[in-house]
C-alpha cells in the first residue's frame, strides 16, 4: 500500500518516510536508508524523519553520521521533549539492536 501511495504522490516526504520506516522495521536497512535520505531532503526540519534516518544510519554502522543527525535534532524547535530525551539516550548508549 505504501509503495502504491509513493507512486501516486512521489514527492510526499511523509509517505517516503513511512515507506523507509517499513523497510527499517523489516531490518532492510540499506533500502530504508535510500527512502529516508530522500524524505530528509524533502522535509529537513522534521525531527521524526531525521530520527528515523539517524536510526537507520546507526544500524548500518554509520555511527558518526547518526550522531551528527541526532545532535542536529536536539537543536530543532519542533522536536518534542520526549523525542529529545530519547535522542539524548541514543547519544550516550547508541541503539541496543545492531546488525
Mark where each language-model region is.
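Conserved structural position within tetratricopeptide repeats
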Residues: 3-7, 38-41, 75
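Canonical tetratricopeptide repeat
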Residues: 18, 52, 86-90
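Helix-start (N-cap) detector for alpha-helical repeat units in TPR-like alpha-solenoids
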Residues: 13-14, 47-48, 81
